[in-house]
Design a protein with these regions (language model features):
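Catalytic-core segments of class I nucleotidyltransferases/pyrophosphorylases
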Residues: 87-177
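Conserved beta-loop-beta/alpha segment of the NTase-like Rossmann-fold superfamily
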Residues: 3-84, 108, 112, 120-125
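Generic low-polarity alpha-helical segments
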Residues: 1, 6-7, 26, 30, ...
């Protein structure tokens, strides 16, 4: 949608691949890169500002991830946080260990990246996982392996109501009207 570039992912090979394909439209850009899922239309602008601000934190994190605590976390990837509050990893629900499934803090999908480091992070994503896909969430562990800080911002679950059906759309519309 003008003035923004649109990029189509030719094959559905995972969220990491979708971002890899989109990077061509960002050639030469070095500012913050915000990655959001189209199925989450209720994320507030204030939340996105907090996500971008977290990327400017004391350790200048390479990535800031949006997190939330749903009533039923069983369908979501988990944010693995160290004792010092640093984000260590994002683990997809189907790849989580029994211990990780006990974590209530879940991946909300949105991420803010350092534009100078995003290409290196995306290029390092592999597809050795339960779905043989390129998971965008792997970038957190990749960044940590490089010694780069990662952060998270927790938001309300009502901002992350996934819209994947007409029923979901009706529910999200009602929530938006109630705001």
């Amino acid at each position: 949608v003008q003035p923004h570039a649109s990029v189509l992912q030719p094959e559905p090979l995972g969220t990491g691949n979708a971002v890899r394909v989109a990077l061509a439209a960002l050639d030469g850009f070095t500012g913050d890169v915000l990655v959001l899922f189209g199925a989450d239309p209720l994320v507030r602008p204030e939340t996105l500002k907090c996500l971008l601000a977290a990327r400017q934190g004391p350790d200048v994190p390479a990535i800031a991830v949006l997190g939330f605590r749903p009533e039923d976390p069983s369908l979501y990837g988990r944010l693995v946080v160290a004792f010092d509050g640093a984000l260590e990893a994002v683990v997809e629900a189907r790849d989580a260990t029994p211990e990780q499934t006990k974590i209530g803090l879940c991946n909300g999908g949105g991420m803010a990246f350092d534009g100078k480091r995003i290409k290196e992070l995306i290029a390092a994503i592999g597809n050795d996982n339960a779905r043989n896909e390129f998971y965008l969430t792997d970038v957190v562990a990749i960044a940590r392996d490089r010694g780069w800080a990662c952060a998270y911002v927790e938001t309300d679950a009502d901002e992350l109501i996934g819209v994947n059906s007409r029923a979901d759309l009706a529910h999200a519309s009602a929530d938006e009207l109630a705001r």
